[in-house]
């Protein structure tokens, strides 16, 4: 039976199940999607019409075509992100009411470039209103090279123009081997990390939850036995359902499940999508004295996220001014976007 415990059973299936506890609906049979982007066409059109009642099916089809077009831009998704996060014009997401959006999750959904034939399959993909905005790659625990291999793999994908639309569309990428961080090693060998798109290489960030009660007290939704069997059957591992190790790996407090709650719970994910990404033109001086400019995309570090949430809480309580204390040597320049 030990052979059944691989990435699927140790991390992937429990993670997909955990996302259902966070309010995502699992999809095991996807047929109506845009092949160039993996956008779920039926869900997208239905959601956009709901958020923009003045639009009809034809308008939404044209909007989808526009999105597919700009996702090919060599801009790390900047044009699309401006459209996604904007509070003006056509709404792709309702940022103020999570329940007014459609949340889906699936596993092993292939990203295929028809022209080159190149493809990759994220272990888990998360959708909001049909848009695949996050994916999770998992490795089994105690695989010394697992996280480093994932970092090398995503770097190759980011540099491959065949995958540009998929990378530009994906806002958040999470990588985990379901172990606690190795704080003695600066190289990301074990733990749960996150990053965003890049033109060259990914920067893996750690995430440390500031609210000790957030994960434990989150209002998780019950998941039906039918949904659990659906996921297990889709991944062809229903035989492990009643094994003790499988039950252990479903705990909300595993490293993978903790980062999913912290970053992909519906309210948190919407906050990140609205405020958590910045595009920066970095200038570098070459050996001959000339200068070159490179467009970079940055995602909030966890310190910035919790500072932002604290500011929002103060504003909600009528506080109009305050100070954020950023200690010496803690990366003020790197975080000041």
Predicted features by range, described:
Residues 2-337:
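ATP-dependent helicase/translocase motor core
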